[in-house]
From Swiss-Prot:
The active site is at 179 (proton acceptor). The keyword GTP-binding does not apply. It comes from Acinetobacter baylyi (strain ATCC 33305 / BD413 / ADP1). Its EC number is 2.1.2.11. This is 3-methyl-2-oxobutanoate hydroxymethyltransferase. Its cofactor is Mg(2+). The gene is panB.
Amino acid sequence: MISLSDLRKFKTEGRKFSCLTCYDASMAKAMEFAEIDSILIGDSLGMVIQGHDSTLPVTVDDMAYHTAAVRRGNQHSFIMTDLPFMSYATLPDALNNAKKVMQAGAQMIKIEGGAWLSESIRVLTQNGIPVCVHLGLTPQSVHVFGGYKLQAKTREAADQLIADCQAVVDAGAAILLLECVPAQLGQEIAELFPQTPVIGIGAGKETDGQVLVAQDMLGLSFGKVARFVRNFMKEQAGETAIVDAFKAYHAAVQDQSFPAREHTFQVEL
C-alpha cells in the first residue's frame, strides 16, 4: 500500500504520481489494477454521484460511506478523503469528522482554504491526522468566487496564494493541492516546497502529482468540460478499456505528456 512517505519519496526522486477521484469499490479495484498511486474520495461525489449542482450538500456520513467502499476495493493506492462543506468550521468538528473518515479507511483528510486554517491543521496533525490543503479554486467556496474560474491571475494574487501555502505548510500540512491556477504558479509552488508534495488539477505539468475526476477523464461528464481535462477513454478499446484508460493516464502523468500545454493556463505573472 502506498504511503505518505512514498509520495514524499516520489517528489524527491522527481517521479510524477497519479491521482484520481473514486467513490465505489469496483472502480477502486480497476484503479488498483492500473496501479494508480493515489485516490481522492472527493466531495465532488455531490455532483458526480448524487446529481447536485455543487459540492455543498455533501455530508460527512456520505464521505465515510464512500471511503469505506473504496478502501475495500483497493489495497494499493494512497487514499485521501475530503471533509465536506462546513464540517471543519470549529476545532471539535474538524477532529470528530476527521476521525470518522479516517476510521472508514482514509490515510489523509483534505480541507479547502488558506492561512486561516492554520490552527485546525496544527491540531489535526498533532492528533495524528495527516492533512492535505486544497488552494486556488476551492469548490466549497464557489459562490464566493462567482463560479468556476481561473484563480491567481495576477502577481499580487499569486503571491497571496504562495503566502497561504507557506502558512499551511508551517502549520503542518503534508500535501498541497492546487486547482485552476496558472501553470507558472504551479511550478513555482512545487519548487518552493521541496519536502511537500504538490498535486495539481489545472495547475500545469510541473506539479509533483496530477488529479482528475475519474468520470471526466473517462468521458462520462456531459456538457462543458474543463480545459484541464483529457479524455483517456476514447483512446482505448476492448474489454478492459476502463483499466487501460487508467493505465494510460498513470503513464502520461509519469512521462509528463499530461498535462500538455492545451490542458494548462498560461498566464504571465
